[in-house]
Amino acid sequence: MGGGGGEQQQLEVLHALDVAKTQWYHFTAIVVAGMGFFTDAYDLFCISLVTKLLGRIYYRVDGSPSPGTLPPHVSASVNGVAFVGTLSGQLFFGWLGDKLGRKRVYGITLMLMVLCSLASALSFGHTPTSVMATLCFFRFWLGFGIGGDYPLSATIMSEYANKKTRGAFIAAVFAMQGFGIITGGLVAILVSASFRAAFPAPPYGEDPVASTPPQADFVWRIILMLGALPAALTYYWRTKMPETARYTALVANNAKQAAADMSKVLQVVEMRNIGNNGGSRRPFGLFSGEFVRRHGLHLVGTSATWLLLDIAFYSQNLFQKDIFSAVGWIPKAATMSALEELFRIARAQTLIALCGTVPGYWFTVALIDVVGRFKIQAVGFFMMTLFMLTLALPYHHWTAPGKNHVGFLLLYGLTFFFANFGPNSTTFIVPAEIFPARLRATCHGISAASGKLGAIVGSFGFLYLAQSPDRSKTEHGYPPGIGVRNSLFLLAACNLLGLLFTFLVPESKGKSLEEMSGDAEAQEEAPPPLQTVL
């Protein structure tokens, strides 16, 4: 069949997707696709909670006035190795998803997450170093699976959705992170409270050895292990998802199979006389001049905004300790037992997430197809810049003992809110909408990997930068830095740069994927609309 007929058949299939009414399968796909992000957020949230417990269990120093803590290089490895794995997985599975198809590799990422979550909890060794080494090994591969879920889930959801509610559906997949955060916090609270009641222990200051009961070693393992359950429960449905019609029609060049796959899960009228396509019309590659001309600046925009956003977003834990100590939520470590400390940290961070982090996700879901991606991202970057400057300029006013705690807490929560009702959501959504189908997962993976590089810089680069310039006031094992206040000024600058790079990213609200990517550029007239079955 000739190329023109093939393009017409492609467009009939794609137009049917664009005008399909919202159906039950869309919501099923959100849950199935979102489980990877649930696991991602659960793991990232919980590992930050249990690191202090790991320090008490494995790095106690006899005679020390304060509990054991993970050495800086060990803490960086335990927390950061999953980021490195995620970055690698985003690039690898993004490329593989375009090469082999979304469906063929989608189950692999979830199985990696399930198995490595369980294996992380079973980390073993005769010495603290060997336990941490095995934990880091499994956390790398956990991150690798999580990384693969970024481009695949975003691409699959964008290619299943209609153009009217596509943004909300992709945002809802990403918003599963909110459920992961809250679930992680609740699990940590319940497990630590249960063990605390079953195995009472004195504060560290009273009895350093007895303050960490032997059973505490089970606590962090149970918390990490339970994160695998929701993902495992959705594995069957993930393997049953058909290949997306857009991949089959535009990349595999089989419009007939695309129509058949679509009819299995979405109720649309059977299309007329559709056969196989004659071939792909514009087979330019990622490194071609044509791609650079048409999408080069778009890729720079999506990658740079995600990079800058994650530098700022993941660095916000720098001043959590100031908030928690200032408002009295977490007393000094020596006045608590190991399980009491875990309970209090989990409770405080869960409350922050519940009030500041999670609502922003769902504001994005509700408004992204009304307001548009560009406005939400630009306003989010602007507000984050404003709030960080407001925190930085009178920083000593906010952190002075005995006052100003409510204002500091409010600004901190609003910064998280406008990150999630802003660029943290839109940087995930837009790369799945604006690139050609045959490069969509690859470009999303590149953008996401740029973001994860920013997360590494934000989490660890600024952890060193934010140390006090006075060596006597730095945390144990860290060299002097530029201080939290100056770090906040740098982060405000990152947000401002993110706002500027946002202007390189096109608005995709209400437009078809083919219109945004140019996949159907040669076809000036769309086929007559196909009516969906009610």
From Swiss-Prot:
The subcellular localization recorded is:
Membrane
Q: How does it sit in the membrane?
A: Multi-pass membrane protein
Q: What induces it?
A: In roots and leaves by phosphate starvation. Down-regulated in roots when colonized by the mycorrhizal fungus G.intraradices. Down-regulated by high phosphate in suspension cell culture.
Instruction: Please name the InterPro entries in this protein's record.
Output: MFS_dom, MFS_sugar_transport-like, MFS_trans_sf, Phos_permease
User: Which ranges make up the Cytoplasmic topological domains here?
Assistant: 1-29, 97-104, 149-168, 238-294, 372-375, 427-445, 508-534
Write out the entry's keywords from A to Z: Membrane, Phosphate transport, Symport, Transmembrane, Transmembrane helix, Transport
The record places the following residue ranges in the Extracellular compartment, namely: 51-75, 126-127, 190-216, 316-350, 397-405, 467-486
Entry's pH dependence statement: Optimum pH is 6.0.
Q: Where is this region: Disordered?
A: 514-534
Which cysteines pair up through disulfides? They are none
Q: What does the record list as GO biological process?
A: phosphate ion transport
Q: Where are the transmembrane segments?
A: 30-50, 76-96, 105-125, 128-148, 169-189, 217-237, 295-315, 351-371, 376-396, 406-426, 446-466, 487-507
Chief subcellular location equals: membrane
Tissue expression pattern: Highly expressed in leaves and at low levels in roots. Expressed in leaf xylem parenchyma cells.
Question: Which GO cellular component terms are attached?
Answer: membrane
Q: What's an example of a GO molecular-function annotation for this chain?
A: symporter activity
- Additional facts recorded: Although related to the sugar transporter family, it does not transport sugars.
Q: What does this protein do?
A: High-affinity transporter for external inorganic phosphate (Pi). Probably involved in Pi uptake, translocation and internal transport throughout the plant.
Query: Which family does this protein fall into?
Result: Belongs to the major facilitator superfamily. Phosphate:H(+) symporter (TC 2.A.1.9) family.
Its protein name is Inorganic phosphate transporter 1-6
Q: Which source organism does the UniProt entry give?
A: Oryza sativa subsp. japonica (Rice)
